[in-house]
Amino acid sequence: MVTAILRAVAVAAAVCLSLAAHAHADPAKVLRVSSKDIASLDPQQGTDLRSTRVASAIFEGLYQFDYLAEPAKVVPNTAEAMPVITGGGKVWTIKLLRGIHFTDSPAFKGKPRELVAEDYVYSIKRSIDPNLLGGDPALTDLIEGARPVVDAARPGAKFDFDAPIAGLRAIDRYTLQIRLTSVDYTLLERLAGLSMTAVAREVVEAAGNDIKSQPVGTGPYMLKEWKRASRVVLEANPNYRGLQFPESTAPRQQALVQSMRGKTLPQIGRIEISIIEEPLPDLLAFSQGNLDYVGLAGDDLNRVLVGSELKPELARMGVVRMRYSAPTIIFTYFNMKDPVVGGYSQAQIALRRAIAMGFNVEESIRVLYGGEALPANQLLPPGVDGHDDSLPPKSIYDPAAARALLDRFGFKDLDGDGYRETPDGKPLTLVRGTLPESWFREFDALWKKNMDAIGIRMEVVQRTFGELLNMSRAGKLMMFNLAYRSLDPSGYEILQTLWSHSPVDGNPSQFANADYDRAYEQFLQTPAGPGRVTLARRMSDISQAYVPMQLSTFGIGNTLLYPWVEGYWPSQFGFSWKYLDIDLAKRKAAGK
């Protein structure tokens, strides 16, 4: 009887909290932002950063990254507390908060649907389903008993979500237990990632192939509208439990914390995301007050600066510039199975190395990034565990050495047209995938100029980003430029791009090297510190020896925001719109 009364009180308190949270999400407060087009709002089928940003407002994981913590720190989200770890690090037990509910869906048949441990069992199973973007081989082998269930779904068979997995089970309604085959120091960060957020099985099954566009989560926002290639609209979740702005003792964050203290979040009732593919229209929309903040780089950043300061007209409006190191690496991968640039022979490696040495990274930083980038000298960017600060940030650009290397391995101009042939006398032509955007046209021109300088003919195949991704997954691109952003401080996702067991979506070059694989697997079992740096350095050395990718730049981020945007912090791993607020009086005074 006492237990029943306590449960009733807990439910009533949860309802009151939800109502209070909804009352604080003001429909008049509309956050206006931009994004390139998104591909999927299914958390287990969303890999690009822009889809991740939107989906992260809708779905919730057991854990999340603290918004303000530096260095990054994992904290509970829907979990009651941090995991209880026993069994020598191999048994993780996690209790869920009670009273969290999914937003309404016809799949729930008019009844409230509480989040339970079984939802995370189902969602983690989806994240290892090989039919969904190839699954997650590393996680599959980490969870005890998962491999046979995953293998039974190959090739093309449906994943059996009812098949028990010994290492993944709900031991009661609110308790999840994960049993591991080995210690893995990245698991906690994985549990804070989008692919481990909770979906409801009945929603997924009802939506079928439309699940990418029918998201139903427990997060602070829910999808109201999605017009492809036009806009996405989110509205505050009326059932959200509400939260307080994070605390911090860092001196540079004190004014921010004080301004947000006491507010129940989310404060913003509606988020309007305009799909804008080009940076110049993005900047124009911001300048006209149609966007509340905007990220800029390269020439577009130079359009708003005089030297290193904002132009007077922007400064007079109170626009703030935030500059920060972004855990991003930009690279061009080589398809290791391509007959021209692929392979592991000395001549094939020499060709890739010469191409990498022939591209002027410093010039690309000046021309394309307005100086706001760093030459990538290793796989992991600054701010990520494993990055070696002792390595000088410089590129390997050396066109004379590139030409000499090509000559040495028989790539010579046999017909006098200024372009080299292969050692067996066949035409040598590089083909890069590229996008129909102004930035990429400049990038393509730089590539062609640099390759002309070392005597290699280069052509491009121009498609939309989605089409290029599909071609990449099918192994039909010779070369393609990609940007990978580490979504957690361990950097394992970036290192995973050269792990041979990753699906093509995760390892687009299809690089395979046993030494690299061993170093990567050891990295997962090594805590943050010097050991990780040593292993990451080893993987970088292996990648530079075989050159499956040409490393280009590390990112520097720049965000401009109007003074009515409150709560903004350039959190590299914990950013969420739920922490923001809009000062309507300031916006009205500015006439925006």
Residue ranges, per PLM feature:
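Bacterial N-terminal signal peptides
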Residues: 8-18
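Short, well-ordered beta-strand elements
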Residues: 28-37, 90-95, 120-123, 176-177, ...
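N-terminal lobe/hinge region of extracytoplasmic solute-binding protein
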Residues: 34-87, 216
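Detector for C-terminal structural segments
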Residues: 29-31, 35, 182-185, 215-216, ...
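Gly/Pro-rich hinge or "lid" segments in bacterial periplasmic/extracellular proteins
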Residues: 68-69, 149-175, 179-272, 277-281, ...
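Extracellular/periplasmic solute-recognition and catalytic clefts
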Residues: 224-235, 259-260, 272-338, 362, ...
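Aromatic- and charge-enriched surface segment that lines or borders ligand/interaction sites
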Residues: 81-139, 177, 282-285, 345-347, ...
